[in-house]
Design a protein with these regions (language model features):
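Switch/communication elements of ASCE P-loop NTPase nucleotide-binding domains
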Residues: 1-57, 287-331, 335-336
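Conserved catalytic network of the ASCE P-loop NTPase/AAA+ motor domain
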Residues: 7-12, 64-66, 116-119, 138
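Switch/connector loops and helix/strand junctions flanking conserved nucleotide-binding motifs
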Residues: 24-28, 43-46, 82, 134-137, ...
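Short, surface-exposed amphipathic charged segments that create phosphate/polyanion-binding patches used
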Residues: 49-56, 110-118, 159-169
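Conserved interdomain hinge at the start of the Helicase C-terminal
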Residues: 56-67
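Conserved helicase/translocase motor-coupling segment
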Residues: 70-153
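Activity-critical C-terminal alpha-helical subdomain
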Residues: 129, 133, 140-245
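Extended, basic/helix-rich recognition subdomains
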Residues: 213-336
Length: 336
């Protein structure tokens, strides 16, 4: 870029046309029009091209995805070597997986990307952690093509029964016995953190409710102060806390393992349940990479675990709904 900046400065009378697939180079040419060459028909000597439109998305992202022919999956995180990136790249081998950072960035990018006329040839979806989202929040996101797993965080995927059974069998262990021990360990940890988890879930809900309710116009500071004083009674944090705590107690009493994985945000859980030790791995990281290595294989085990991941993300149902919608659209006839 420095070389070409110098050359352009020396010859302001010239128009420079660059042909490049280098994203950094293309985005480094400031204040220039970017022509996206989609294809070339040598028989008719015809080019199919478009000017990349200005969008809320970054130029780097637009250029990177312009020549991509696969559906795009946007995920959280900045590190291309993160667990999320490695796992979802293997779970969705036919998609281009792109980390974006925050969950809000994923949600906004999916919405914007799907609205772009120039990118109508590409389908895009997103994945965000469930964290402490309510069922209503999750359903809203799924309707917007944002996949939300039925586990609280990505590490919990490695505690799914299908994953544990598959890895135990591959390691020559008793799958039923190991799964039973893991379930007991997870349940014990959950019981010890029920109050804390109920409080954290309550905090998330109240924070979201405050953001919605405080976003109002006030004629004066007194009106705003009055509104804020009334918020506690309107939001009823203790009522939400008691409801959530009772719900979590019911999950524990029912030994609802999948229900606990859905709501339990606790980073040390995978390490504390000692699944890696039971399977002969030195650390939780070794176990995780063992699962990832298995997913790279062309085996029935990889297919089984991949399907379990897609199911927990509701990706299988999303695909079925889209196919059903396309079928209904194709069957619709216009009556003159």
């Amino acid at each position: 870029n420095t070389l070409w900046d110098t050359i352009e400065a020396l010859r302001p009378d010239c128009t420079f046309v660059y042909n490049s697939v280098d994203v950094d180079f293309v985005t480094g040419r400031a204040a220039n029009a970017c022509l996206w060459v989609k294809s070339y028909d040598s028989d008719s000597h015809a080019w199919d091209y478009d000017l990349l439109e200005k969008t809320p998305l970054s130029d780097e992202l637009m250029v990177e995805l312009a020549g991509n022919r696969r559906p795009v999956l946007f995920i959280e995180g900045d590190d291309r070597h993160s667990i999320d990136m490695r796992l979802y790249s293997l779970a969705f081998p036919d998609m281009k997986v792109r980390p974006l950072g925050s969950c809000n960035k994923v949600i906004e990018t999916v919405r914007t990307f799907n609205d772009l006329n120039s990118m109508h040839h590409l389908q895009s979806m997103g994945i965000v952690d469930r964290d402490r989202r309510t069922d209503a929040e999750v359903e809203y996101l799924r309707q917007k093509k944002i996949l939300v797993p039925d586990v609280a965080e990505v590490e919990n995927i490695f505690l799914l029964p299908e994953v544990i059974r598959t890895m135990a069998t591959r390691r020559g262990k008793n799958a039923d016995k190991i799964l039973s021990k893991v379930r007991a360990n997870v349940l014990r940890q959950f019981r010890a953190h029920i109050d804390e988890q109920a409080l954290q879930h309550t905090r998330h809900k109240i924070k979201r409710d405050v953001e919605c309710r405080i976003d109002a116009r006030f004629n004066c500071i007194t009106a705003m102060e009055t509104h804020l004083r009334q918020l506690v009674n309107k939001l009823q944090p203790r009522s939400h806390y008691n409801r959530l705590r009772n719900e979590f107690l019911r999950l524990a009493e029912a030994d609802d393992y999948l229900g606990i994985l859905r709501v339990f945000n606790h980073k040390p859980m995978l390490s504390n349940c000692n699944l890696h030790g039971m399977l002969g791995y030195k650390s939780p990281s070794d176990y995780i990479y063992g699962v990832l290595d298995m997913l790279k294989t062309d085996s029935n085990d990889a297919t089984h675990v991949r399907n379990a991941i897609l199911h927990i993300l509701h990706a299988d149902r999303q695909d079925a709904q889209e196919k059903n919608g396309q079928t209904q659209s194709n069957n619709t006839k216009t009556v003159p």
